[in-house]
């Protein structure tokens, strides 16, 4: 068994996806030093990439307005490389919406593209910068209309 990364400071990692062409890995990473207000949950996770022993955040997170373009306002999970390995799709839950009302924190799908880095001017101790520009590609609504294309929860890819 080869260990490519070991989490520290009480963080958890999981759901590893391997790059289709090189020895590169992307996976879910939970928060370091979790506490009663910030713990391993959908809207507190991030994507992390490991390549040649170098570790970097895939996505940036900015939960303080004004928000940074290309950064997420919550957690990414279930990361999957595109067939050519250039982009990464992921599922997403929004911390800001969860704080307003958990019923508004609807799962979406996003794409991380290699147009970074995305540098966050950290105004909250849990904010961080990332290597990729992220954008959501799904649209959800809390109350989808029957017979419409509206959804209240998006899934992988």
Model-derived features with residue positions:
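Sequence signature of WD/YWTD-type beta-propeller architectures
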Residues: 1-157
């Amino acid at each position: 068994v080869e260990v490519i990364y070991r989490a520290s400071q009480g963080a958890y990692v999981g759901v590893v996806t391997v790059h289709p062409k090189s020895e590169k890995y992307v996976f879910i990473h939970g928060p370091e030093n979790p506490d009663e207000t910030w713990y391993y949950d959908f809207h507190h996770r991030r994507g992390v990439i490991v390549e040649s022993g170098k570790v970097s955040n895939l996505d940036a997170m900015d939960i303080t307005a004004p928000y940074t373009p290309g950064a997420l306002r919550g957690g990414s999970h279930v990361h999957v490389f595109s067939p050519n390995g250039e982009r990464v799709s992921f599922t997403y839950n929004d911390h800001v919406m969860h704080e307003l009302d958990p019923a508004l924190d609807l799962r979406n799908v996003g794409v991380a593209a290699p147009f970074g880095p995305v540098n966050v001017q950290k105004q909250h101790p849990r904010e961080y910068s990332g290597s990729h520009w992220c954008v959501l590609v799904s649209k959800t609504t809390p109350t989808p209309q029957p017979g419409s294309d509206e959804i209240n929860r998006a899934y992988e890819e």
